[in-house]
Each structure stands twice: as C-alpha cells, then as structure tokens.
A protein has these predicted regions:
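Soluble catalytic domains of enzymes that build or remodel membrane lipids, polysaccharides, and related
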Residues: 138-363
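Non-catalytic terminal accessory segments
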Residues: 1-130, 362
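Context-gated lysine
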Residues: 1, 12, 74, 133, ...
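N-terminal signal-anchor transmembrane helix
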Residues: 72-77, 98-174, 191-192
C-alpha cells in the first residue's frame, strides 16, 4: 500500500530520532569512558570490540527504556545521558587544549573528572530551580493593565506531578489574569489525571496550544483529560478575554503552519492579539496577520550547553524577546518551564514568564 504523507512524516521522525540516539549514545555513554581510559594509560581495557559492545549495550538499554521495559531505571539512563553530555563537552575541550598546550596527563584527567563532576552537580541543581522573568508590553489597543503568564515545555512525564504543583503555586503567587501554556505540557503516554491534577488549582483562566509532544503522545485521550481539569485547548481557535484575543495554532512540521492557519481563524477587531504557537517559526506571517505578541517555546534554549549552538543552527530565535522589524509586534521564545529527559540545565533555566500588558505610556 502507498504510504500517506502522515506515515512518511512519522517514519522520517522515527529514523531521525534513532539516528540521534545512536550519535548521542556514543557521545554521552561511550566517548567519555574511552577517552578517560586512554588518557590514564588503560586503553587496553577498551579495545574496539569492547567499545562497540558497550555502545550496543547502551542502545539496547535505551530502547528497552523507551519501550517501558525498564521503567524503574529509566531516570538512571536519562540522567546518565545528561551527565555524559557534560563530560563529553569537557573531554572535547581537553582534547583541543592538549593539541595546543603541554598538559600533564594525570593532572589533566583529574581536572576533566573534577570539572565534569562539578558542572554535572550544578546542572542537576539548576534543573530544579524556577526563574520568573518579567516583561512589559504597551499597546494603544489596551486601556487597562492585564497580566498574562506563559508556561511552556513543562514536560510532565519527564517531570513529576509534584513539580507541576510547584509551578502552579508560583503562578498563583503572581496573580495572573490569564495563563497560557505554549505546548509540550506532557511528553509521556502514561501521564494521567494524578500527574496533572495541579492544573485544577490554577487561579486564572488557563489555555493550552498544542506542541509536538502532545502530538506524539496522542490528542484523543489527552485533550479531554486537560479540558476536564479546567484548561481550554485552543486548536486553530481563539478566545477573547476583555481586550485580549488569545489565538492557538497546533504545532506542525511545516514551516508554513502559521501562514496557512492564521487567516482561517475568526478575529475580533480592535483586540490585542496574542498568538500561541509552539515552535519559534512563522513570526513574519504572524505580524503580517495582525498579531501583536507571539509566544513560543520548543527550544529549551539548548537546555544543556553547548547544545544551544546546535539549536541555534536550526532556529534563529531560541530565547528571549524579539521585536518585529516594523516595530508593530513582539515575539517571545521561552526557554521552557521544565526539562525533557534529564532534569538538568546548564547555561539555561526553567522559566515562568510574566507579561504585564498595558496602555501606551502606562509603563
């Protein structure tokens, strides 16, 4: 049978994912062990058959973990990967330094291990912190203040229901008029009402736009679940709250998703238009379509440095507030409120973003 476009897209995603896993498994689990063994003079412990065997064992473990067969030790696998990425970066820097400078072998390796361990501990600590970032946006369309709070990439599944409770408590303390979640609220099929129950305690109208992980998990079960917890899901739809019109568009692989979907959504004239779109793409089409503020996520700002450079190679906007070239609108890319995979951040932070919207000249 001929494959549909959706099937091709799914298989392409699977192939790309497992190619990434192959490379990431070697970089995080194998390369640091092989390199440190070589530097210490124990390369005979890691001949190439042993190296290949270790690589294959790691990939098998990851596959079993993703399939749910090793659910109890999945956190160990993913955190080992995060720590391995930190050591990979430190090892690469050390390799480059050895080409340029005379470095004592054993002292150098001790430095690699010490710096890698310190950065790993810092990453684990930083993965638990939540930073509140405030922005002021003025518009002649507004006559009174409105506080909008953005969450993005919370990743319940990778993160626990307890973490969501912490997030909700911080959000409620900010006194928002509305809360928006710009995709990737969950990332695991097994997430249910128990993990998401804290959403019922949000003290303001809450809206969700669909991210890529919601699509992967499956919307047939997820959408009714989050709606039963008081969250309005905006799928190619809008909602008016006073002078604000919130517009949600589903995440898609296509770079033209905003250009295609935005003109089809009914709009109210004179409102301050806020677009919720998960990927930081399509902002020119958004501003051309009358959007005043576009909110995105997806990038995690790289989550664990130096992956921010890899993310930057794919997306030109990865974190922060970007003005429209015409000066008429703004685009904010959240670094994410949670973490995917290891609960670690290096060179980035978990963020709750506040937008204090108000009339021009009012601050």
């Amino acid at each position: 049978k001929r494959m549909t476009g959706q099937s091709v897209s799914r298989w392409k995603r699977v192939v790309v994912f497992w190619l990434f896993v192959l490379v990431a498994a070697y970089a995080a689990y194998v390369y640091p062990v092989v390199s440190i063994s070589r530097w210490l003079g124990y390369s005979q412990w890691m001949p190439w058959p042993v190296t290949i065997g270790l690589w294959a064992l790691v990939i098998l473990g990851l596959w079993c973990s993703f399939r749910g067969h090793l659910r109890m030790i999945k956190p160990l696998w993913v955190h080992w990967m995060g720590i391995g990425f930190v050591f990979f970066s430190v090892c690469v820097v050390y390799e480059l330094l050895c080409l340029l400078l005379p470095i004592d072998g054993h002292r150098g390796v001790l430095g690699v291990i010490s710096i890698g361990a310190l950065l790993s501990l810092l990453s684990l600590f930083n993965g638990q912190r939540i930073v509140v970032k405030s922005n002021n946006c003025a518009s002649p369309k507004l006559t009174r203040p409105f506080r909008l709070v953005q969450l993005s990439d919370v990743h319940i599944g990778s993160r626990s229901g307890r973490y969501l409770t912490r997030v909700v408590d911080r959000v409620n303390a900010l006194g928002p008029d509305a809360v928006v979640i710009t995709g990737d609220l969950v990332d695991t099929e097994t997430v249910g009402e128990a993990e998401l129950a804290a959403l019922k305690k949000v003290g303001a109208p809450t809206f969700l736009s669909i991210g890529n992980h919601e699509r992967y998990v499956g919307l047939d079960a997820l959408q009714p679940l989050v709606e039963s917890l008081g969250v309005t899901v905006l799928r190619q739809a809008s909602q008016v709250i006073g002078e604000i019109q919130l517009i949600g568009i589903d995440d898609a692989e296509s770079a033209d998703q905003v250009a295609v979907q935005l003109p089809l959504i009914e709009r109210c004239g004179g409102k301050y238009n806020v677009l919720l779109y998960h990927r930081p793409l399509g902002w020119l089409d958004a501003f051309a379509g009358g959007i005043d503020l576009m909110l995105s996520g997806h990038t995690h700002n790289g989550q664990i440095s130096p992956f921010n450079w890899l993310v930057r190679a794919q997306f030109s906007r990865i974190h922060g507030l970007y003005p429209a070239s015409s000066g008429a609108g703004q685009h904010y890319v959240s670094p994410g409120t949670g973490t995917w995979g290891p609960v670690m951040r290096l060179g980035s932070h978990n963020e709750i973003t506040v937008f204090d919207l108000g009339p021009t000249g009012d601050g």
